Amino acid sequence: MQAFFLACMLPAFLFGKGEVVYTRLQALYSNNAGGWNIEKVVLSDTATVVSFSVRAKPYSWIQMASSTYLSDEKAVEYPVRKAVGLTLDEKFYMPKSGKTEFQLIFAPMPKDTKIFDMIEGDGRDMACWYGLHDAKSKVKMPVAREEVDAEEVGENMFRTGKAVVRGKIEGYKPGWGYGIVAVTDNTLGSRPESSSSALIRPDGTFCLDWPLEHPVWDELKPGCGPDIPVYVRPGDTLDLVIKAKGDGIETVEYTSSHPKGCYEKLLKCKVPEVYAEWERKGEIWKTLTDEEFWAMTKETMETGNRLCDYFVWKYGLSPWEAHLLKARQQVAVVINQTVLANWMLSSRYGYYPPNEELRKDFYEGNDYSLYKVLNEMPTDDPSMSFIPYFRAMVSRMKDMQPMTDAWSLASMGDVDWSDVEGQRLMDSLQVEALRGVMGVKEIPYLVQAYLVNKVCDLPDFLTPEGRKKIVEYRAACLTNPYLKRKIWKLASDYAQPLPATTKLEGKALEILQPIVDKYKGKYVQIEWMKPRKSGVD
């Protein structure tokens, strides 16, 4: 009865001759869409109507945002015009039955559209359907061709330099983005204080200096609101024209000083990372078998890669852009699955025996085959450093079971793990464990990066000479020129203590207190300027 009533409420002009009706809708991937089912899509000359059925807990609420839009095969967007059965941006409380139906009416998509997306918005919890198509249409999606751009990963790209990101926010209003934009330093061994930021001027412009060591595909982050994807290299100048819409962003246009540009098509691909979402299934690591682990990993990888193939086809990405897109997806899955492997093996092996005589037997001969999941990402590709997740991947490798077991083995016997020889033994055991798991003879880029990043965690009580010996040993394992330079830079940086913090008092507090009071609750960037010809800072 409700479905009939809603159909009667729809304007008669929506259903005319020549309309195209899709049922049996399938999606390549959906997110935050549990309990929501797209029953029918009608394409006509005047509108596109999407009919939903929803199942949820009785008296709970659902919501659909007015930012919802459809995106067709050519990435043209069609905004929602109205809803029937609920009000956009308002909570709809489910009836006692836990079932409801409603329709969304969009601007008309071409009637020959065979596959499309429906996106509620950029919010983390907003519903998204990618690659919607009628099951009968048999949409064929080619596997994307991948290729590493030799020029982009050339040695001259791995150099210290500054990128400049300039922006103009059209429709800027004070308070947009909290008046600040920032970027996170995701290079190996980076510290939080090395991030860069810039204030947005009253006219909506900003200029951010970004120290780099290689190209990066990352995000410019306003103080609030959606992030802005960017691709920059050392020495690049990237100009952005950002069209604001309320507190959000409607469009971003890019202009790069580099002859190859900034891969604007790639930046406009809003591809979500696909995860197995095992965290939502309780403590499954206690009973999960290896076979189930690999089946989960395979399914997640296939779904993620298939989604990337779709976006490569939809946006016409180059083989190099396709490689970056898929690599980001693969790194994200590998990070997530190695955490699951950690939990599984920790649950299986438990705690080490209290009797030291039994510990060596406890740590030797363990099955680390779950960590072959590392091979699901490009392990010997320097362009992995361009992806922000790579630093997280390398940092978390120290928590892998073979890494912690190697640390324990190195601490046994007459060798002191905290001394130079103990550190060398631990490095050797860890590298051999990784090579064994990955089935490689050489030391791939991923493992070399892990050795470099470990410099950040050298014990504080080591003497300068001891630190130097350990770094020399690790540097001898490296073949990548950038990583060879990087390990010595990190060794120098981390040999220095962190900057001390000083309580504001006296004249400094007197100067800053009015600023703190005026901008309370907002980000404030303060620059201390040294007067010319003055010895006082």
Regions found by a protein language model. Name each.
Residues 133-319:
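A non-transmembrane, solvent-exposed segment enriched in polar/low-complexity residues
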Residues 101, 129, 203, 227, ...:
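Extracellular structured ligand-interaction cores
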Residues 27-30, 126, 130-164, 175, ...:
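Phosphate/pyrophosphate-recognition segments in soluble nucleotide-handling domains
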Residues 1-21:
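Bacterial Sec-dependent N-terminal signal peptides
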Residues 117-121, 221, 344:
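"Short basic amphipathic alpha-helical interaction patches in structured regions
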Residues 43-45, 95-99, 109-111, 158, ...:
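Surface-exposed coil/turn segments at beta-strand junctions on protein surfaces, enriched
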Residues 17-143:
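Conserved functional micro-motifs across diverse proteins
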Residues 244-536:
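Oxidative protein folding and maturation machinery
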